UniProtKB/Swiss-Prot annotation:
Catalytic activity from the UniProt record: myo-inositol + O2 = D-glucuronate + H2O + H(+)
Pathway: Polyol metabolism; myo-inositol degradation into D-glucuronate; D-glucuronate from myo-inositol: step 1/1
UniProt protein name: Probable inositol oxygenase
Record-listed E.C. numbers: 1.13.99.1
Organism, scientific name: Oryza sativa subsp. japonica (Rice)
Protein role: Involved in the biosynthesis of UDP-glucuronic acid (UDP-GlcA), providing nucleotide sugars for cell-wall polymers. May be also involved in plant ascorbate biosynthesis.
InterPro entries found in the cross-reference section: Inositol_oxygenase (IPR007828)
MF terms in GO: inositol oxygenase activity; iron ion binding
């Protein structure tokens, strides 16, 4: 099955615009007329991504980042990419993978403690409402977190610190905008002169495709999609690999590593992030009602069975 997909152009979407540029909390925020309304607080009554707010999840989340920042090294990421990039663990369809995630809750997320299928459908449906003609973006919303299947026993039952959480480049200096930055000081790469400078193992404008990111569900699903020859546009693959890269799309860090294609795709990632982050709620989606639509998109952009 071969489908030719043109790269989407954000500027061509009527009644939508990306305002601002560079970093910052409001950088490139999507402006929608009568579209998705950003809620004031998360399911726990706190501001979204508030890692200091007292809540029942605060200690769990901080301990997660402590272990994550200590162990996500350049060598560790290379080993994990080599192991899981072979996509030889099993074969299954996209929807089968979605159902596997039902039993998992993300320990790095301060905003939600519901099974992952709820978040996937909330994200996809919110995007679908505001971007009805961008079916590739609906599907990207549905599958962006499927790499969390690494938590399942069939995939080695990896610890959460190596599957979820904000991502960041390894092989160069850790930026101070990273959540709980202080714990990087215990990472072996922190004092390695070959890996702790601004560019480290990379060069200016080398392109994020050439940068190793901390290992987790983002990079894994990106590898799975590429190895199974998805026909999603490059913006979809960019969203999958970098949707947890908050230092970039929230704070504007690490932009010196990006090339021109990355900068164009970043516009779509910032659009996507609004739905990924703010659609999290305790409202339930009728799975059986929306399943036929998403099954049609899966058939359009992926083979029936994927190698994982």
């Amino acid at each position: 099955m071969t489908i030719t997909i043109e790269q989407p152009h954000l500027d061509a979407i009527a009644d939508r615009k990306v305002a601002g540029g560079g970093g910052g909390d409001n950088a490139a925020e999507l402006v929608l007329d009568g579209g998705f309304v950003v809620p004031d607080s998360n399911a726990f009554g706190n501001a979204f991504r508030n890692y200091e707010a007292e809540s029942e999840r605060k200690e769990t989340v901080e301990e997660f980042y402590r272990v994550n920042h200590i162990n996500q090294t350049y060598d560790f990421v290379r080993r994990m990419r080599e192991e899981y990039g072979r996509v030889d663990k099993t074969e299954m369809g996209i929807w089968e993978c979605i159902e596997l995630l039902n039993e998992f809750i993300d320990d790095s997320d301060p905003d939600l403690d519901m099974p992952q299928i709820e978040h996937l459908l909330q994200t996809a449906e919110a995007i679908r409402k505001d971007f009805p003609d961008e079916d590739w973006l609906h599907l990207t919303g549905l599958i962006h977190d499927l790499g969390k299947v690494l938590l399942h026993p069939s995939f080695g039952e990896l610890p959460q610190w190596s599957v979820v959480g904000d991502t960041f480049p390894v092989g160069c200096a850790f930026d101070e905008c990273n959540v709980h930055f202080k714990y990087f000081k215990e990472n072996p790469d922190y004092l390695n002169p070959k890996l702790n400078t601004k560019f480290g193992a990379y060069s200016e404008g080398c392109g994020l495709d050439n940068v190793l990111m901390s290992w987790g569900h983002d990079d894994y699903m990106y590898l799975v999609a590429k190895e199974n020859k998805t026909t999603l546009p490059s913006a979809g693959l960019f969203i999958i690999r970098y949707h947890s890269f908050y230092p970039l799309h929230k704070h504007g860090a690490y932009m010196h590593l990006m090339n021109d294609e990355d900068k164009e795709n970043l516009k779509w990632l910032r659009v996507f992030n609004k739905y990924d982050l703010y659609s999290k709620s305790n409202e339930r989606i009728d799975v059986e009602k929306v399943k036929p639509y998403y099954m049609s998109l899966i058939e359009k952009y992926f083979p029936a069975k994927l190698r994982w």
